[in-house]
Amino acid sequence: MTLSSLASLRVAITVFPGSNCDRDMMVAVEQLTNRRPALVWHKEASLDPVDLVIVPGGFSFGDYLRCGALAGRSPIMNAVMDHAARGGAVLGVCNGFQVLTETGMLPGVLIRNAGLRFSCRMVRLETAETMPSPFTAGLTAGQSLDIPVA
């Protein structure tokens, strides 16, 4: 996936109860690709052929730690995991990242921050190695990125 191929990009966006960022993501994808992405309800068991599945933010099933656990067990996530296993791209944003962690698609677990309070700051990340991913294709090993974290 490259910037020049965005016009042909087929995108699906998952929708869960309580989600509130799926429509924002739909607008962003449509503006970027000039194509309307498919919105896929969490109870669906399959995906139409797509190049990218986005699991957006927005507090699926509630606003608390491990809220992604319920979403991660929704029928659509089996289809998302199958898509990824076939080499398809998957992007998890905010709560969507939590969902991908809860499904085991991403390693590790999420924990509460040490202060138990909302934190909003910039964090500098450094790429450890290059990965064969459309999201990191333009990055080199050792490159620093300033990322907002909230």
Predicted regions and their residues:
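A structural signal for conserved, well-ordered secondary-structure elements
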Residues: 95
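Pocket-forming structural segment of enzyme catalytic cores
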Residues: 105-150
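N-terminal beta1-alpha1 cap of cysteine-dependent amidohydrolase-like domains
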Residues: 1-92, 100-107, 118-119, 126
